[in-house]
């Protein structure tokens, strides 16, 4: 770290001079010379720039404060990375680093040129940035003007000049484009360059459409990002998350394309089917109109006479005339209909024909792939999809609800949340990277500080100074204000004038700091909130007076509290506490509001009183925590919010510039009265509202208008950009930030803060109550004793028991609050008592349970078997019952007790029997199913009604019997201590009461009817019987406390907005309405309620003073309004009423109060985005906590172990496959070679893509030629795919069907052929277009084969597959909730008036229709339209209306029941179940991503076994050791070990079995360890995985390794060592012998004795040199035999034949040395 230390003193900051530049040039030359000389340049230390010294960042504190004269001056670069490059830095105010290129700018201006230095000074000056920022903001203001003044052109020139000046300064100071850090090297400057270029281009050249070019000016707003440093970071994060989204986007587009193709095939042309008036002429003709097979009249005409031609002409004109279509009230599109049995039907005298254009200006349809894709995209984003759902079901039939269920659950929930998961993960990764970087910096700085300390310690003179000054400096550093302020504060803000004043302060302090005062203030806050919430419209004068007085009292209390606290604490210390500042602001605002109470328009100040509610956070930990989370998120979201604001601004201006004029010119296309609609882009504010609405997820409605007035292309582009950039990315990042604020630590941290004042006060009260209770009980006992002078054993025992209870109560209550150490004797006695009690209890429990005849309880206890305990009934009653009624405790060993015990045992055996349980489940399902038949048509089907009545009795009796049996079997104690049994008990009670009332003839009573409704809860009994649902319910129940807490906090948040709404809008949503024309009166005719009432009294019966059903007249209905706004359903009507509102009881005027839109914008941000997303955060966090409690596998594993575990988990489930053998037949062999080539698969994939394209080209009502061409193309594709199928079957034979994808291909081909052959037959003989269309869907199956080739998509689909079991359980629970609510709906809303969204198809009349409605509401879609008719009151409905075929009268709903019904369902399904869905997808996506990012993934193991097949064709699981090198080289990365790999493979130490073979598992384990890095702790895991492999592969040969590769190598090395040693020994002998022979020959026969005279070596030597001694000794001696043995051993050692001794003994080098 020493090298990173900054230089000390004047060395730190050095001016950049010509000599500095020369030094850099010299360094560069040295570097280049080294390169030329091929010397390595030592760049390892500084291979990249220091992150702390990046341009734009402040100088690290470690470098110290630069001298003032060196600011804004060129300095030498401090970053070691740049010290050998031509750069210099400039430090501006705040020590911000700016880096420049040291080359001459524009080839003219050197770094030392005064002009360039001046430009640099301007550029880095903080005022210059501020000036540019101000210019941009001013320019933005001018851009928002829809009708700019005449002088704006001049201002535009000024802006252009300023931007040009800025660019010039940048170019002069930095250079243009050559070299580092020049103007164009920064991508953000490209933006400036483009903006300026476009400005000049539009001025100098006439380019036609100026409005399009003017929109480029809006990009100037992006310049704010370049000016504010933090924004660059957040934009970088956004770009990163978009990159990560690539795979998710591809999958989304692919799935949408598939769904769009399905929609195209199923619903093509359906949405053009309308109800057309039957012409009067036709009724007189003999045409069989309704039986026409083609559905319209033209095909029925015969002959060519003129009359028919005229008729034909008139008929065409008639059916294409929109006036002849049937329209519902208030609808601009005609009523759709269908020809299938479950589709929508037309009213009388209307017929269903396919004519005219599609709904919504013709933009909602499935007639071509493009429109189908748009429809499905809309469905996926859930925007106004209820409209598409209703239109499609009305035209095609209710059966197709299945299509929407699949798309909503797979498309909408999965894909949209997958995008959320990806963004959240990208954010989390970035967070981790930032934290890691911060940690690294911290470590670096610590090292630097240590080094600096050492350096300073060397200077002895500084030591004392440091000791004295350090603490003082530390304190001074934390003083934010100048010293004069502290002097002022000490004099004026600390009141310590005299001792009596200080005494008063102490007294006041004791009062105001007392916990009871805090409790009192909290109660006052709650009461004040209740008082504010009681405000409503209309209010009596007395009630208004009461509220006013209450407000004065509370304001007085809070003012008094503030004043007393200020006196007690002194202002200086009072304002140090955040909560006190908050209090003081609210109190001040309340006092100001009282002063300005009568000033018109300032009633909004009353809303500040609502902020008092937040004071509850002081004593409510959850509220405090959630406010902190929101606070933290808002802090982190500061930059993100700014980016969002910039995006909204840019798109609003773009929209205004591109489409504003068109809205004005073509307004008649979208508005009947040719006035601008509420949603338009003619001015900036309305354009902003549209963009905000798109960010809320509502885009399709306004896009239709845009497309109608401005053309389709531009509108689609702009809207899709807003949707993708704004909605999907920014809002998801927003949610990711919110989720990241949640953690278990966050929630747990609250417990560590200790008790607050409120808890202390409550605990004191509890203790006081407990003491009082004890005292009263004790005195009552004494009183009773004195009154009754009977002291028998029973009363003594009773008294002891009471005393014990009192003592127990006392100990419990005191123990709760004080932890007192217990003495040993005390604790022992307590324990022994407890043991005795348990023993007594156990013995009686055994006695009653076992019904044994054995008298001795101890013997009984010893003999009891655990299995028997579980199979015997429990105690019948609880402990208290036995103590109060001793007669209940009967002897079960004899007499009646024994009989009783046997009966209970028999009951127990029955209820524990699986058949009994199955029977009950079957009865529950039957009884639930029976409820579905009780619809409005039941009266017409008397047989079904009678069957249901008898069935109801049977079910009730069965369930009563079951309940009684369980009472007998389990006993009351066990039965009623189980929550599920309680549920059963209550449901059976309801059925029993209902049945009794029916028998007694009271079934028509209102109370009994309501009770009968509760039978809908019967299906809940299924919960305890189905494991999957029970798991989900248990998880939910675990999360209930957290969810309830958040719900409560949301209600508090919403309460503030609701009260504010009541203050702003109470009584202002009413209007005078003309029933005849269905329009509001104009303000000029009727100004207020008084004038409207006068009109009504003047006998105008069609006039009514109406109020909006959902309004802000009180807090309760205000909550409903907010729920509609938060779910974006029905919010338009509320907003329109708000912006049109004037005064109480005044007639509204169009957009008179337009800025009230901002109330809703603020609520949506805080009330919807934040609070509703908190639910997701809480649920995910709660699941993580539950998982931690359960102790999931991964909690006890390190990251390294987790990697091993994942790899081994995948590895253990694999086994080597036997490859498909190549056929011996030559022809089959050729086909086999063809179909197994990769190019063949690629070719088929290309064909599938082409096939998909041809399917996309299909449109409704296409020409005959096009139809024929597409038909034959389809035939060609079917032929090709059939050929592929046949070829593969020929080549692979029976093995073809062993591969899943092949089976899928085969099924698709068969279906395609059937579709082709049966199409004509079906169309001709069975008029069922549905069946025909479904068969055509088989072609889409081919497209799914593309998934096989895409790895990235496979990961995402793997996440879905992992989620499926859990999602299925949630789906079951959701279905159960829907089922129960459907039955409730049928009971309560079956006869509601048909209006809004309740009509002949979507209603609660039948079970099927109810389910359709509830499926729609599951995503909160259209619930406002279903609630609206239910909230009708007379005269909007008729309570006495007779409903044919039933005794039920009236068509009015029940508003209270309706609101509770829909609110409960939305909270349960939308907020809980759907959010659980999201939580599971996020969880599993993380797991899947971890798995895919693991060093080894599934594909790597597949690749291993695919390669193995080639080396082990018989699937023996072994290969020869000699093949190992080739095998490892053939593998792909990361498992591959490329050649030369011999040494590497030896080091793997692979076990060898007889025959020099190695097992596949051993190789794979070794290669896995090689990739992951070997570790000792993994040995056990490896053993486990081997066992798993053995279990998965019973065919695996059990083997005992005889050696290993490493051991084999060691043996070979040892053998070589022995060989060398022996060779050396033989060489020495040979040399001695050769030497002797040479001397003997040169010097004659000497007298010296030969070194060796016997042995094989000597013999061979003599033969070689022709020694005579050889011939003299013809017989072989004993030594020769020994020599022969020597030879054999030597041959073994050398493994070579003994041809020539010298060659045998010596290698080449030895031979040469010997010669």
Curated annotation (Swiss-Prot):
Disulfide-bonded cysteines: 275-337, 346-352, 668-674, 706-715, 1072-1092, 1437-1452
The principal localisation class reads: membrane
- Topological type in the membrane: Multi-pass membrane protein
UniProt key word Transmembrane: yes
Residues forming coiled coils: none
Q: Which residues lie on this side of the membrane: Cytoplasmic?
A: 1-126, 174-187, 229-247, 422-515, 566-579, 620-635, 735-915, 966-979, 1026-1042, 1177-1239, 1288-1299, 1348-1366, 1482-1715
Q: According to the record, which residues are glycosylated?
A: 209, 284, 304, 339, 1074, 1088
Concerning InterPro entries, the annotation shows: Ion_trans_dom, Na_channel_asu, Na_chnl_inactivation_gate, Na_trans_assoc_dom, VGCC_Ca_Na, Volt_channel_dom_sf
Q: Extracellular side of the membrane: what ranges?
A: 146-152, 206-211, 268-368, 394-400, 535-545, 600-601, 655-683, 705-715, 934-946, 999-1006, 1063-1115, 1138-1154, 1258-1268, 1318-1330, 1385-1406, 1430-1458
Q: Which UniProt keywords apply?
A: Cell membrane, Disulfide bond, Glycoprotein, Ion channel, Ion transport, Membrane, Repeat, Sodium, Sodium channel, Sodium transport, Transmembrane, Transmembrane helix, Transport, Voltage-gated channel
Intramembrane parts occur at: 369-393, 684-704, 1116-1137, 1407-1429
- Give this protein's Gene Ontology molecular function annotations: voltage-gated sodium channel activity
User: Quick one: a GO biological-process term for this protein?
Assistant: membrane depolarization during action potential
Q: Give me the segments passing through the membrane.
A: 127-145, 153-173, 188-205, 212-228, 248-267, 401-421, 516-534, 546-565, 580-599, 602-619, 636-654, 716-734, 916-933, 947-965, 980-998, 1007-1025, 1043-1062, 1155-1176, 1240-1257, 1269-1287, 1300-1317, 1331-1347, 1367-1384, 1459-1481
The residue ranges flagged as biased composition, category Acidic residues, are 825-838
The UniProt family comment states:
Belongs to the sodium channel (TC 1.A.1.10) family. Nav1.4/SCN4A subfamily.
Q: What's the subunit arrangement here?
A: Voltage-gated sodium (Nav) channels consist of an ion-conducting alpha subunit which is functional on its own associated with regulatory beta subunits.
Name used for this protein in its record: Sodium channel protein type 4 subunit alpha B
Q: What is the lineage of its organism?
A: Eukaryota, Metazoa, Chordata, Craniata, Vertebrata
Q: What is this protein's gene name? A: scn4ab
